[in-house]
Amino acid sequence: MAEAERALAVLIDFENLALGFKGKRNKKFDVNKILERLVEKGKIIVKKAYADWTSYEDYKKTFHEAAIELMEIPKRGMVGKNSADIRLAVDAIDLCYSKEHIDTFVIVSGDSDFSPLVSKLKENGKHVIGMGMKDSSSNLLINNCDEFIYYEDLERPVGIPPEIRRDLPKKKKDAFQLLIDSVVALVRENKEILWSSMIKQTMKRKKPSFSEQYHGYRTFSDLLEDAEKSGLVRLKTDPKSNTYIVVGFGKESDEGRRS
C-alpha cells in the first residue's frame, strides 16, 4: 500500500545558487519550481534560505510569498568559510536532534563543503536529497546524497497525458488537472504502483484544500471512475484491498479493463 509520508526540512544555500545562475542570460532562479517538486516527496515542515539578502532584494518578495524563512547572513567582509554555509549546517544538525519527526533533509546547494553534513545526517538515519545546478554542483556532494536533483531537470517531461475537455464545468476540470499533475509527479518519482490513496495524498500535498466533495464527488473513487470515463486515466482494482490502482493515461479497450 502507500508508503508513509516523509517530513522534509528544506535548507537553501542561496549564495551558492546565485553563483550558479550568474552569467546565464534570461534565466532567473524560481524557488517555486523547487517547492512544487519537493511536495511530491512529502510534507515540507521547515523552509529556510540563507544569504546576505541585502544583495538579493529582487528575490525577497517571492521567497516571502512562498513562506520561506529568510536567514540574514551579513558578509561584513568575511573571508574564508562562507558564513551562510556554517549557519545552514548548524541549523541542519539542530533540526536533526531536536525535531526527530523530520526524516528527510533537502540541501539546495552544489557546494562540496556540505558533504560532511550530509554524512552526519545519514549517520543519524536521515534521508538526504541534494539539489543544484548541473554545471556548478560538486560530484563529491552529488555522490554522497541519497539522491540528487538537478534544477534544470525540474520540468523534465514524463510523457504526454490526455487533454481535458474544455467544455467541462470548471470544478471538474480543476479536479481532473490536479489528478493528472499528481499522477505525472508519481510517475516521475518512479512509483511502480499508483494506489488511489497515494494519488489522493499527492493531490493534497499539491493543494492542501483539495476535497473531492467540493468538486462534486461523493468519494475519491467516484472521481477516479469519472476520470476514466472521460478517457484521462486507466484503472484496475487490487484484488486484496479492493481499491483502485491507476495503471496509465488514456483509454483502453473494454477487454481486460480492471482485471
Predicted feature residues:
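Active-site histidine-anchored catalytic micro-motif
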Residues: 103-109, 116-117, 121-126, 131-132
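Short, glycine/polar-rich helix-capping loops at beta-to-alpha or helix-loop-helix junctions
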Residues: 56-60, 133-141
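Short, well-ordered beta-strand core segments
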Residues: 70, 105, 128, 148-149
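Basic nucleic-acid-binding interfaces
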Residues: 100
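Contiguous mid-protein beta-loop-alpha structural module that forms a pocket-lining wall or clamp
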Residues: 137-156
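Domain-level signal for Mg2+-assisted phosphodiester chemistry and nucleotide/NA-binding surfaces
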Residues: 1-97, 117-122, 127
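N-terminal regulatory modules in eukaryotic regulatory proteins
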Residues: 131, 161-259
